[in-house]
Amino acid sequence: MKDLVPMLISTVLGTLVGWERQMGRKPAGLRTHTLVCLGSTLFVLLTEHAVREFGGPSLDPTRIIHGVVTGVGFLGAGSILRQEGYVHGLTTAASIWMVAAIGTAVGVHSYGLAIISTVLALLVLEGYRWVERWLTPGDDSNG
């Protein structure tokens, strides 16, 4: 039951980032970001359980973090498209990678770090949009 708190926190934080992407009609939105964040948390929590249950010198819990980063990299790569000289989806790929990191932070019970990272991610995703528009007027290819 103690795992319910990190799972709920992860769901909320992933949803916040996913909502921003959904409102911008980006390739990966609410469900994708929420599930990636939640899945990352679950993998870390499962590793914690495995170490407690089967612990030993050969069981390295940091390997799961490596696996999450690698797996999410493939998912993010699927959101990147190149079309007519423009590359689309890089920001969405980065946000997928970011929610995996947020979910991992929640999984290791670093809730403050996860919340601060979510706030900063939202500031970058939403706040930098006006900076990009100011720097490149008439160019809607950002994000």
Regions found by a protein language model. Name each.
Residues 21, 93-110:
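Interfacial segments of multi-pass membrane proteins
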Residues 61, 80-91:
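Short, amphipathic, aromatic/basic-enriched membrane-interface segments that mark the entry/exit
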Residues 70-74, 91-96:
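Hydrophobic alpha-helical membrane segments
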Residues 48-49, 65-75:
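Ligand-binding beta-strand-loop-alpha-helix segment within the catalytic cores
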Residues 120-130:
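Alpha-helical transmembrane segments and their membrane-interface exit regions
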Residues 74, 99-100, 125-126:
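Hydrophobic transmembrane alpha-helices of multi-pass small-molecule transporters
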Residues 1-64, 107-116, 132-138, 142-143:
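Alpha-helical transmembrane segments and their membrane-interface boundaries
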Residues 12-20, 71-78, 103:
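Hydrophobic transmembrane alpha-helices of secondary-active transporters
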